[in-house]
Swiss-Prot record:
It catalyses: (4aS,6R)-4a-hydroxy-L-erythro-5,6,7,8-tetrahydrobiopterin = (6R)-L-erythro-6,7-dihydrobiopterin + H2O. Its EC number is 4.2.1.96. Pfam families: Pterin_4a. This is Putative pterin-4-alpha-carbinolamine dehydratase. GO terms for molecular function: 4-alpha-hydroxytetrahydrobiopterin dehydratase activity. It comes from the Bacteria. One of its GO terms (biological process) is tetrahydrobiopterin biosynthetic process. It is an enzyme of class 4 (lyase).
Length: 112
C-alpha cells in the first residue's frame, strides 16, 4: 500500500462511507502514534505532540494550519505550552474517513 503521507485527500460528502472496522484496523497500524477517541458518539483520531516551549508548539501549529488549507481538510487543534493536541475526523460524516488517516500521517511528517 502507498504510504498515507503520499496520498491526497478526496472530497468527502455527507453520504461518504465511514471507514469499516477492517479498514480502521489496517489504517491505524500505519499511524502507530495516534489513538482513536470517541466524543459525543463521533470516532476521531488524536495525538499529542510535545515541544520544548510555546514558540515551537506555535510554529508546529502554523505549519499544520498551512497543511490543512492545502488539503482542504481541517483538524481540531489545541496549542498550549510545550504541546499541541491534534484531532482529525470528518465533520460531514461525523466519523472517520480515509482522509483523516492521510492527514494524520501528513501531520507526523511535519516533524521530519
Amino acid at each position: 500500500m502507498t504510504a498515507l503521507s503520499n496520498m491526497k485527500c478526496e472530497a468527502c460528502q455527507a453520504d461518504a462511507p465511514k471507514v469499516t472496522d477492517e479498514e480502521l484496523a489496517e489504517l491505524i497500524r500505519m499511524i502507530p502514534d495516534w489513538g482513536v477517541q470517541v466524543r459525543d458518539g463521533v470516532m476521531q483520531l488524536e495525538r499529542i505532540y510535545k515541544f520544548k516551549n510555546f514558540k515551537l508548539a506555535m510554529a508546529f501549529t502554523n505549519k499544520l494550519a498551512d497543511l490543512a488549507e492545502e488539503e482542504f481538510h481541517h483538524p481540531g487543534i489545541f496549542t498550549e505550552w510545550g504541546k499541541v493536541t491534534v484531532t482529525w475526523w470528518s465533520h460531514s460524516i461525523k466519523g472517520l474517513h480515509k482522509n483523516d488517516f492521510i492527514m494524520a500521517a501528513k501531520t507526523d511528517q511535519l516533524l521530519v
